[in-house]
A protein has these predicted regions:
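Hydrophobic membrane-insertion alpha-helices, especially the h-region
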Residues: 393-407
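Residues that define the loop-to-transmembrane-helix transition and helix capping
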Residues: 172, 262-263
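Aromatic- and glycine-rich beta-strand/loop motifs that create alpha-glucan
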Residues: 355-395
């Protein structure tokens, strides 16, 4: 503790010396009064270019923040446990069958696991911090899985479905092979994108020597209640994220299996994904519709936000962490989606009985084609481009995206912010 306090004092002194020098320099005062050649930090600072001088000062300030955090972390963890003991002494929290009581007990127990974690200064944590907050590899993984599943469903459109379905003993084998292909693809695609991004992050920021340091060295993980190294957390994040990609891929495969036309399944997928993105970014966390933001595909793919934040849910004496809830829900969805997809592949027939409604639609379509045959060639070409080739769908999707981003650029204010602004204007 003494060495830490000494280091903090030295860093603060260096920052103060540099800032006094910069202030004197900006006021065109005589800087020689400050720089007499004896200050090592000023000697290094003055030998740098203007750009590197700013980086040098910023680095010192970051070091000061990190030193303060490291020195306060043990006391912070100790205070969590002491607060738990104090809260249980109050009568309103003393009911042993209540969620509040059991949540206090679990919180104290969980953070006792990291009470012995020793933090220390490292070169930098930016490689891991940048990686776990960069979610595009998982979004790209899902997009690639859409293409893979679309390709696996090719027999629905190329006339081979009848041939595939006629092999009675082969349908289950085909379904199981596809199950393994989708699972393996999810693991490999996610690993390729995730670890290539990790390598790029290490190349860009450096800090490979810091990977063995506790992940709690990163200030964003001060409420992470598991003793784990930074490289350990990278693997932990990858495992959870891969599971999420595989589960969503299984759900997507089930959607493709249950739709007789894979293009219909693709359109449904795009529309649903667009709706999920819209709800995640447009619904406020305090809105009555916040459940659509909490239970959302986008939030599911932002795995780090869930597993790195300490939060419990439950009822009565049953208390469980959000990360555990996420894992259980993913496993349940995975099993259901896999069973539906495999069963659908085995059971669904290429042909289905024509209902009365289908026959009526066929008659309407015949009349439509009879009228359409008399149209000019230009109208037929437009019909082929917009309707037959589904160009109108692409146009509508692009239009919706443009309208969304145009509207998203506007500032939105809560009622409390509007009230504060009104008070300010009236005063």
């Amino acid at each position: 503790d003494y060495q830490m306090d000494e280091a903090m004092e030295a860093v603060r002194s260096d920052i103060q010396t540099i800032e006094m020098y910069r202030q004197a320099d900006s006021l065109a005062q005589d800087t020689e009064l400050l720089y007499d050649g004896t200050s090592e930090v000023l000697k290094r600072y003055c030998g740098l270019s203007e750009h590197n001088q700013k980086l040098f000062l910023d680095t010192l300030k970051e070091l000061e923040i990190q030193l303060e955090y490291i020195s306060e972390y043990p006391e912070d963890i100790k205070m969590i446990q002491e607060n738990a003991q104090q809260l249980m002494s109050f009568s309103i929290f003393s009911d042993k069958n209540s969620f509040t009581y059991n949540n206090i007990i679990k919180t104290a127990k969980d953070f006792s696991k990291v009470s012995e974690v020793s933090l220390y200064i490292v070169d930098n944590n930016k490689a891991v911090e940048g990686l776990v907050n960069y979610y595009f590899p998982f979004y790209l993984s899902l997009i690639m899985m859409v293409f893979i599943i679309y390709g696996l469903s090719g027999e629905r459109d190329n006339g081979m479905w009848e041939v595939v379905h006629s092999a009675g003993n082969g349908r289950l084998r085909l379904a199981l092979h596809r199950l393994m292909v989708i699972t393996g693809s999810g693991v490999i695609v996610t690993a390729g994108l995730y670890f290539s991004t990790f390598a790029a992050s290490l190349f860009l920021y450096g800090g490979a020597d810091s990977l063995s340091a506790p992940v709690q060295n990163i200030q964003a993980f001060k409420r992470f209640a598991m003793p784990m190294s930074q490289i350990g957390y990278v693997m932990y994040d990858y495992a959870y994220s891969t599971l999420a990609v595989i589960v969503l891929s299984m759900v997507l495969w089930a959607v493709f299996v249950l739709n007789r036309k894979r293009n219909h399944a693709l359109i449904m997928t795009v529309l649903f994904a667009g709706l999920e993105v819209f709800m995640y970014f447009r619904i406020d966390i305090h809105s009555v519709y916040s459940a659509f933001k909490q239970f959302n595909i986008v939030r599911l793919m932002r795995v780090n936000e869930i597993i790195s934040t300490y939060a419990n849910r439950g009822k009565g004496s049953f208390v469980i962490s959000e990360s555990a809830i996420m894992f259980c829900v993913l496993i349940v969805i995975l099993c259901i989606a896999a069973v539906v997809a495999v069963s659908g592949t085995v059971v669904m027939r290429p042909q289905q009985k024509r209902s009365v409604f289908t026959k009526i639609l066929d008659k309407i379509y015949e009349g439509y084609q009879h009228i359409f045959s008399k149209m000019p060639a230009v109208v037929k070409e437009l019909h082929k481009l917009l309707i037959t080739s589904r160009g109108i769908t692409v146009i509508l999707v692009l239009l919706a995206i443009v309208i969304y981003f145009v509207g998203y650029g506007r500032m939105t204010f809560s009622d409390s912010m509007k009230q504060c602004d009104r008070i300010y204007l009236e005063s």
